[in-house]
Amino acid sequence: MDYGILGSSDLDQCSKLAAKLQTNLLLPLIYPLIRDGQFKSRFLQKRLEKCSAEKGDYVRAFMAMFGAARPYVTMQSCKNQFYSDLITPLPEGIDVPGTEIHIFYALKMGAKYRARYQQHFAHPVIHEQDLQHEELLACYPYKWAQLVKSIAEQRV
């Protein structure tokens, strides 16, 4: 593999107990949004609408990218993905000969994410974007595609 590309990933990791607690607490709140396209909780739905009004295009584009209702996605499937994402160990200093790791770093996520990228990858190529989490892909898909293309064409 010549390139690995991460798009403002959080690389969250935690213990099995913490992952189980997070999964069991958060998934019942989030799952209706995935399955039905909206929160079951009126409070959360109103917060989403308020956030959408305040942050405008970013939240709308993120939700559009996230997609509409997915009635075919099961709670168990989401639970498995959410939990396994948190407990899958990611070693430090990953360095695969012949592979460049490129990271689309959304500066508005905070400096702790840059530190995580540098912790887990020996020589990451960090592409800074003055954006929020996944905003490049959600709001500027053409720019995202151009960046991916420019990375892929480096060794052609």
What are these regions, as identified by a protein language model?
Residues 34-94:
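Conserved alpha/beta-hydrolase catalytic His-Asp/Glu region
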Residues 128-145:
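Catalytic histidine-centered segment of alpha/beta-hydrolase-like enzymes
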